[in-house]
Amino acid sequence: MPNIKKSQKINPELKARIIEQIKKRSGPMFAIFDFDNTCIVNDITEATLTYICKNRLLRDFSLLDGDNTDIDLYHKKFIQTYYQLLKDGKIFDGYLLIVKMFSGFTKKEAEHIVLQTIKSEGKNIGSSKLYGVKIAHGLKVQSNIISLINYLKLNKIKVHILSASSEIAVAVATKYFKIDTDNIIGMKHIIKNGIITSSFKKPYSILGGKVDCMRKYISRTKSPLLGADDSNTGISILDTSSIKVGVNRNNELTKIAKKRKWFLI
């Protein structure tokens, strides 16, 4: 029988299910966590977009159609376009646009911007407006999720973060917030001559593409012992997971989780 550790404070029913799954399985086991609004409160990529647009830092002026010679107008149009795409239900297009904001930067410059974003956001959760768009403010860890990650790690379960955000941004944030993960998979920028381009390696870690990423980067055949997400944009991974955990944000995923009797934390 596996030597199961029980010290972490998590939901007793969830803990029992984890122990049950560990006993059933053999060989290496893994769990997959979304990052934004799952491991942390709010979204590191959206926060970084706010920082970039506030400070007018975009370098690639070919990301939107039209005449983009007016720098102030371009930043306004970029952030408004992103949130309008989400509002219109064009999730894939919105997610693909926002991760292009690092186009024209070096990796080191992008990492610095993300770090400055985290420091400027602080931990007080609230909201503000930028260019008429309501923007979430503040970044902090989700303590219940971190306890769950630590419990899984304690029991030798590999923890992978699989996010639709820029892999660069998530890597900086996990390091800053000291989140213990074995692997980070996000949107992988194509870098040419040291400069980030507006193109990405496939498969894209967006919507159903998350499963393709899991099969390419984690396991071709095995499925997660546990999957955790905050939104129905991650439902493809949750559907493959033996234990399904939703972060309760009173959204569509919350309704699905309650209906299907998934765990909510």
Pin down the residues of each PLM region.
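Non-catalytic pre-domain segments flanking phosphatase-related domains
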Residues: 1-35, 42-46, 50-64, 68
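C-terminal cap/substrate-recognition subdomain and adjoining C-terminal extension
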Residues: 2-13, 17, 23-30, 112-115, ...
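Preference for short coil/turn "hinge" residues that link or interrupt alpha-helices
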Residues: 33, 95-98, 172
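Residue-level preference for alpha-helix termini and adjacent loops
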Residues: 39, 101, 189-190
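Generic structural signal for well-ordered beta-strand positions
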Residues: 40-41, 197
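A generic alpha-helix surface/boundary motif
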Residues: 43, 92-93, 168, 208
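A metal-dependent, Asp-based hydrolase signature
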Residues: 44-45, 52-53, 57-136, 143
